[in-house]
Amino acid sequence: MSEPPLVPGPIYGLRTWGVAGEPGEERLTGPQLGAPWPPGGAMLEATCDVRPLHEPPGADCDCGLHAFHPRRASARRVCGMRGQVPGILEAAGAVEVHPDGFRAARGRPAALVLLPRGNAPLLERLAAAYDAELLRLDGPGALLEHCRTHGLGLSEPVVAELVGHERMREGRAERRRLVRRFAAGWAVFLVLVAGYVVVANPHTQHGKVLHGRTGEVRVP
């Protein structure tokens, strides 16, 4: 299998950040490790301690700064992450492109997204601290439209040319499999819950048909 393509930045993608620090001194952090990102528009340089030592993004590693291509699913994902700040990453240096996103050698928050129920004073302070644009948007659709209008992110045809149409098809097939697995697991969970409710209520009449959100459930 060929290695994922490396392309030069800048490339833009969607991601989220955590927030740490006292009021007035907040800093954006990586949502996984919690490492602070440098303010003032500076680029964060990705590092990796996995041996053998290499420069991020490594082809056989998961290192680098991660972001999603601007798509409906990714916009919903970043806007729906509780306790995190959605935004747009400006990636530079070597960038390894994948069907759903990319990993970059370095990057900075180019824009932060303030949603209708977001903390406006906090986002205003963070945008000023990071010299980032503050986008006041009403949801994922508006974020995706902003990216399309301003030419931010790699389009699906460009990604397909970079990673190959076969890998794109494989990626879509894998996402469909994951959706089916989730739906099947959720259905099993609902059946178990329905069974628990029936067992927990000794006054339930056997043979009775119960109506719930998932449809009819017949009491054995």
Segments from the language model and where they lie:
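ADP-ribosyltransferase catalytic core
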Residues: 52-124
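Juxtamembrane amphipathic/hinge helix adjacent to a transmembrane helix
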Residues: 147-173
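N-terminal "first-domain core" detector
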Residues: 1-44
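C-terminal single-pass membrane-anchor helix
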Residues: 169-220
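Short, aromatic/basic amphipathic alpha-helical patches
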Residues: 120-131, 147
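Short acidic-hydrophobic, aromatic-tinged amphipathic segments that line or gate anion-handling sites
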Residues: 133-142, 157
